[in-house]
Amino acid sequence: ADVFIYVGGESDAWVKTVLDGVDNPNLRVVTLMDCVELLDEETVEGMQTEKHDHDHAADDAEPDEHVWTSPRNAARICQKLADTFAAADSVHAAAYAQRCGDYVEKLNQLDAEFQDVVEHAARKTVVFADRFPLRYFADAYGLDYYAAYPGCADAAEPSAATVAFLIDKVRAEGIPVVFTIELSNGKLADTICEATGAKKLEFATCHNVTAQAFADGATYLQLMERNVQALREALN
């Protein structure tokens, strides 16, 4: 390979061993987490934290790996990739630059749509009856959030305290939408919605897609455009 791309962080700790064994001095490595300003994964009020799939103490903060969830970060990542491809394949450098510019323009438009939704919203709080791998997204648009688990948690059955907290929060703040993320079973969201009358909607983290969505050619931009509409409904 000429270029090796990976996210980085605890989940990709195995990559270093692989790269250490590669005899290719010309290999260019891009770590997505090196492309952006990192934020630590955080635990917010009401969040269940007993189970976690990373080997670190509960009190040890680690960087959130889901850097692509902010369109602004996605633009930075695209620029780094384009620069790396151009360096590895200089004959086509102009083409990489052009395509990157075109795509970043679309990402900037997406960013503007999210900003508009938040600026004209009736509230700035979202509720996720699920894991919350959207720290960068929430930070980019000044959103407050409540969720069942941190972004990298092993989402087992939620505790009664977590369920009760989220139900109370939705009722108290009149939250109209409770989010799940892709490939979630949605059971916790169903419980909260049944208790509060809120509506269950999916918010795509662009981390996973179904086999059918992949076959249909789902893209980051398509998934994020759906998120624009879902967020508009959740904040109004």
Question: What label would you give each PLM region?
Answer:
Residues 1-236:
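Extracytoplasmic metal-acquisition and chelation regions
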